[in-house]
C-alpha cells in the first residue's frame, strides 16, 4: 500500500511543485485493484477501462492539490480558476467512486439471489416486485446519455429508487446511498458490443455480486437510522 506521503510526492513531481509547496487539500485517492473474471468482457476492454479509471484517480489528486493555491478572492460564475477546479473536482471524484462501485458489484461468476434475501425483499417491497425493479433498472441503463444507472437508497424516504446519471455529475440525487451501479458509458462496452447497450447490460446483470449489494444495503439502512 502506497502511503499518503508517497502519493503527495508523486503529485508534486507530476505538477513540478517543490517540497515547500503545500498540498494540504490533496485528498489523495488511491487506485484499487479488481479481479474481473467475467467472460462477458474482453481482456482489451477490461484493461482499457482499468486505465481510464486510473486516469480519474490521478486527475482527482492533481485537482485537489491545485485547489490549495487557487485564487479564492477573484472568483466569479462566468470564468475563474476556482470555479473550474471545483467543477472538475466533482466530476473526477464521482467518476472514480462510481467506477469502484461498478467494478465491485459485477463479475460474480456464482451470482445468485434468493427470494428470502435482503436485496430481493427490499427491491420487491419498493418496486412492487423484483422483476419490476429489474425492468426499471434496465430502462435506466438505456435512458442514460453516456453515464450511469444506479439503484439508490433514499435516506430521506428510506426507500430504494433507480436513477439515471448523465456523464458523472448530472442528475445525481442528493441524500442517496448507491447500492447497485452500472456503467453505461460506451467505453464500458463498445469494444465488445458496439452500440448494443441492452445486450451488454443483460450480461452484466447475470453476474451482479449480490453479496456486495447486500452489504451496501445494510450500510445504507444503518446510516438512515443514525440521521433520522
Specify the residue positions occupied by each region the protein language model found.
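Feature for soluble, non-membrane regions of globular proteins
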Residues: 3-6, 10, 14-228
